[in-house]
Amino acid sequence: MSQPITRENFDEWMIPVYAPAPFIPVRGEGSRLWDQQGKEYIDFAGGIAVNALGHAHPELREALNEQASKFWHTGNGYTNEPVLRLAKKLIDATFADRVFFCNSGAEANEAALKLARKFAHDRYGCHKSGIVAFKNAFHGRTLFTVSAGGQPAYSQDFAPLPPDIRHAAYNDINSASALIDDSTCAVIVEPIQGEGGVVPASNAFLHGLRELCDRHNALLIFDEVQTGVGRTGELYAYMHYGVTPDLLTTAKALGGGFPVGALLATEECASVMTVGTHGTTYGGNPLASAVAGKVLDLINTPEMLNGVKQRHDWFVERLNTVNHRCGLFSEIRGLGLLIGCVLNADYAGQAKQISQEAAKAGVMVLIAGGNVVRFAPALNVSEEEVTTGLDRFAAACEHFVSRGSS
């Protein structure tokens, strides 16, 4: 008989790069989770915007089990039917002509940045290598992507960092214009900065970046790892803005909880990549591809995407009610089901404490820095789950405020 597992085992056995909650979830269904003691939680964290269809969705389980009974992996020396079907679905649904599959958002962004450098080198010469990114962005944890992220706290311990990466102020087209020139190979931007505080880009900002990239022959990369696959009420957030990127990265919700990432590219951009220029052992794995294909089937429908917009209204209405009672937030912002509640000055820096109180009350939420409580629930979360979860969140907020004033 195996020994019981406890939260303390994490501190004993794991490299301490995370500080997980004091409870261990063991079972989930829809937007509910239960821990080892049987306590129920309403899940508004969604695995950090990953569990787009909740936990243990029956059609995703069926897709996974069906493929698992056939074969699991062959490597990139062979292709497979699920990955080709998935590629065609993404191409048909977006601007893209070609797809590269990998295992995570960081890998997708790494591939995009490498492709952009190679595209510029092949077309214009090695002098055209500059990458412009944005302060407070997050693009992953590889050395290249963490350098592009523009958050020194994540990169400062790993110098020397890759060169020729500069950071402009987000939503400031004049700041970006001062950095983008003929030596720039790419601009990478999140349509909504997720980890940076749930900050949506302005329409003028993204249109301005498209114009600057066209003027200077630079590729425009949209990092849609967090905003993609229905999260904002469109399949991808670029569709809200009417700005088409040259490259788009996607992951998180694409697998509905199964690890998968992808780089979407135009034919012109993809043409510079040849056999051996990039790759990954697990990319396009048939298990991941079978699940992701079913995720797209379920999410890319008018009913689901319109439902995300409706659920946004449920959340914002109820969060405003919570705020009227507690007075915690200066702003509630975001698109679709990526929502950030910005703490006012009296509670600055205490988002983590609020998330901990929420967990005690039986609801899981995220943070986006010290000042923003973030919600990224399942796209199919029910109205009952929203009501129950936000009632628990309200109780947590009231307890937090009363504790602070006592």
From Swiss-Prot:
The keyword Transferase applies. Pathway: Amino-acid degradation; L-arginine degradation via AST pathway; L-glutamate and succinate from L-arginine: step 3/5. Its EC number is 2.6.1.81. The keyword Transferase applies. Its cofactor is pyridoxal 5'-phosphate. One of its GO terms (molecular function) is identical protein binding. The modification N6-(pyridoxal phosphate)lysine is found at K252. PROSITE patterns: AA_TRANSFER_CLASS_3. It holds the Pfam family Aminotran_3. It catalyses: N(2)-succinyl-L-ornithine + 2-oxoglutarate = N-succinyl-L-glutamate 5-semialdehyde + L-glutamate. InterPro entries: Ac/SucOrn_transaminase_bac, AcOrn/SuccOrn_fam, Aminotrans_3, Aminotrans_3_PPA_site, Class-III_PLP-dep_AT, PyrdxlP-dep_Trfase, PyrdxlP-dep_Trfase_major, PyrdxlP-dep_Trfase_small. Keywords: Aminotransferase, Arginine metabolism, Pyridoxal phosphate, Transferase. GO terms for biological process: alpha-amino acid biosynthetic process; arginine catabolic process to glutamate; arginine catabolic process to succinate; ornithine catabolic process. HAMAP family: ArgD_aminotrans_3, AstC_aminotrans_3. Belongs to the class-III pyridoxal-phosphate-dependent aminotransferase family. AstC subfamily. Catalyzes the transamination of N(2)-succinylornithine and alpha-ketoglutarate into N(2)-succinylglutamate semialdehyde and glutamate. Can also act as an acetylornithine aminotransferase. PANTHER family: AMINOTRANSFERASE CLASS III (PTHR11986), SUCCINYLORNITHINE TRANSAMINASE (PTHR11986:SF113). This is Succinylornithine transaminase.
